[in-house]
């Protein structure tokens, strides 16, 4: 029963329903910015706080898409419980929920699977001691197993295998067939029953020779392709006929066009009969010869040309679909399928054998991947011997009893295996079930991860708003964006997103509704710019060769500068008002980062700070390339190119002349041999000595490579060559050092896998390069820096920005998968080309043709969803940036469909689009503010600012950017620059300006607690000045090699932070913990020796220490910032509280000290005097954060194991 919504509630009616609805499976279709996470958290909280039937938080299974989302969810729930506890401070139920929260099942699906496996591993007979392998390790392992697989087949001289190799590999390599095996294996793992799915592939080719194409399971997609072609032909003929009736139109062609319409009508009739009849009709199509233009007629030449062009397009459309789908008789297509069955059977057997070998290898190494986690979990939860049925096992029944509700975030991104797992742990009856699913199928953009949006769509279409057989709730109100952005997005997607191409219809339920009422009332249109690359003939030779990427970057840079100069104001909800736009408010979204480097270079020239996490460029970075070359030489010095690269690099620093001298020592053979011969010659010049020293170092490094971990070797190289410090002094040194640290970290991760050694690491790097799987430049920027962000649309999902630029909208869709010789589909399996056994000619099979058609529509649907994600990231201002080679030709093409009577654009138009710009152009051509002068769909409420920028304007701006180069060069050379007199007054005003609050400048805006302690004279009145570090320190080589008291205190605090209070704290237990911290590199062995273990154990033997171990809540090393009044100014106090715990007596605050109290006369009183003020600040901070009073405060001195209670004022 849904409770009535209070009048003052901030929730919408739909959100309120989503929070309280129960009794059946519920699907919440949450549009972008609709507050779905807030709704999900509130639903969980209300279930926990229910007055009559409260549920413990650990009886809820909450599945999120990422670990970050799970952590945020847990944090939000914790904060909500804290707020509830403030209102009911004595509630044992709430305290219990806070204690249960940390072990509650709020995680990704993989984390939940891991928990299930850890608990029930014995059910499926696997070793519980395993680790999760990373992608790099698995790639190497799969490559190794593939090689083993092919070696075995070749050794067996297997005839069916050799037939497959003969027909489907090149003369030089088996790489194509190996890739197919690997892709089939990976694809099968997204199915709940991989082996069954592979067998289904074979069944798809189990076709009798007399079968009809109409009866094949994928025939629908073939017919649909024909339908779209005929629809396009009909539409164009209708346009052509209309033009013949216009004044000056070629009416003499009317009868010819009417005849063409009859041809199309006959094709449509045949299409509804059978594929055989359609085949015959398509092959026998004959268009009438067009009548000649009468000599005495006065005709508009443009209309004549338009009609002829439209008719040519019709003929080309019919010819193209005929050539694509009707090249062979239907009986031939069927025969090809029949003859392909032995081939497909062999390939499937190879995949199954590969899976078996790979599993054995993983078992041997004790590793699993994320796919294994899902399948192991499914095997545990599914009842045995029911491979094709989804019946719960005893383990699944346990979880069904355990979880009162299963809540799934981002449900549109689940796959079929994950869906099966969720069904098994929930009540699977949709009418009375307990699964709550939240998502937005319009944002399902992870097809490359084999996500299955159809699972969401099926439920969306099956569930009803009244809950009959499952409840559907639409959250359409968007609380993120301005109304203009939502109206613009709706205008585009009402026309684009159809069931034929977009998988769903963008109707009123799917449309975005404005909900962010706090925005100031002003109109900010969506801006769409087309940069026209068409060159004027007179200027063509003078224009520079600028790419589309550079042009877009220049326009964006110009606009960003303009926005900051105007200035443009954005609404800040934290300030509850407007503020000036900052760089960090702006994001540039790209479909991919392939052109990011070129854009970044252009922004650098325009002095616009832009940061992007590049997915490529890491291996080509100079510093990384040099270090990899050095590793190659250490592995094998008989490699000329890496050796020459190292010798020419700053590590050695030879020039061409030196290299030539070395080569003359031995003109033949490897360069390393020449180098060895060179140093043995009787010379004593500087080059000989230098190379002798370097060869000695190389020998030491080669020995070290055999004796120590790879990561340690790399750090040794950084240290001994000084290369790390050297690149730090180069331009972009911070980024270069980050790249070198990334190489060290990657080597460290590699050593933790089942592979070892420098040779295999280098081979692993080479494989990454071959697959174009770059690491991307290492991150050297924090999120808080004031720069423009550039990222992919995928990376932006879930984020929001005040100003969004969608760049590269005219870039063509990636249809590379459709050009492959084989295609895969979850329903229809494998589509391959038929290779004639004698002629070796290859032809597409009907299965391949159908699957390719389906794939294309799926790819377009996903591209449509990606565009939707991009447009809905913007909060206040959206720019769509496109380029066009010939804008007039584009406008003419878009205008052809502007007269469509329905909101939805014709499906063939959407299908034939090559880019986002095409889709947007077709849509905007029909808007009253659109590019084309006349349209059918008019007076839409969306506001657009659409303009065309000639490319030459941006090319001229590049020259203008360089006009002050002489001034810049003068400044760089420290030469005086004459300044115009009109600026003198302003310059002088700025130079001689004085700050009215100068006294406040000597008081730091942010103070540490220790600094405040000294300033307050807490030590007893003798410290007149705050402690300041000596400006000149003694050199390190003159300092004593011993640990300072401050360092010792840090080590003691670190150990106290990690003491396991859930177990008895003994001397042995603490020593074991210190040993683990040394192994984990938390402590060095030297630092471990100064830890006073006995004083740590002594603390836990005190009454307070024992109470800490029993506490209901324990927080250690709690950082805080506190606004504090000081000398009439507000400063921010920063500190870290050692320990706070809560038990039945209230909040207890403890601070650890390493002071030498044994030297004090009255240690308790001295500690109280010394730290009274500091502990008062700590108490003030905790009470402000936790909203509760601190009842007890203590100082514990390790020296003497002295526990001192502090007075609480």
From Swiss-Prot:
One of its GO terms (biological process) is double-strand break repair via homologous recombination. GO terms for cellular component: cytosol; DNA helicase complex. Residues 510-798 form the UvrD-like helicase C-terminal domain. One of its GO terms (molecular function) is ATP binding. InterPro entries: AddA, DNA_helicase_UvrD-like_C, DNA_helicase_UvrD/REP, P-loop_NTPase, PDDEXK-like_dom_sf, PDDEXK_AddAB-type, Restrct_endonuc-II-like, UvrD-like_ATP-bd. Keywords: ATP-binding, DNA damage, DNA repair, DNA-binding, Exonuclease, Helicase, Hydrolase, Isomerase, Nuclease, Nucleotide-binding. Its EC number is 3.1.-.-, 5.6.2.4. Gene3D superfamilies: 3.90.320.10, P-loop containing nucleotide triphosphate hydrolases (3.40.50.300). Residues 9-482 form the UvrD-like helicase ATP-binding domain. PROSITE patterns: UVRD_HELICASE_ATP_BIND (PS51198), UVRD_HELICASE_CTER (PS51217). Its cofactor is Mg(2+). Belongs to the helicase family. AddA subfamily. The heterodimer acts as both an ATP-dependent DNA helicase and an ATP-dependent, dual-direction single-stranded exonuclease. Recognizes the chi site generating a DNA molecule suitable for the initiation of homologous recombination. The AddA nuclease domain is required for chi fragment generation; this subunit has the helicase and 3' -> 5' nuclease activities. PANTHER family: ATP-DEPENDENT HELICASE_NUCLEASE SUBUNIT A, UVRD / RECB / PCRA DNA HELICASE FAMILY MEMBER. Heterodimer of AddA and AddB/RexB. This is ATP-dependent helicase/nuclease subunit A. It comes from Anoxybacillus flavithermus (strain DSM 21510 / WK1).
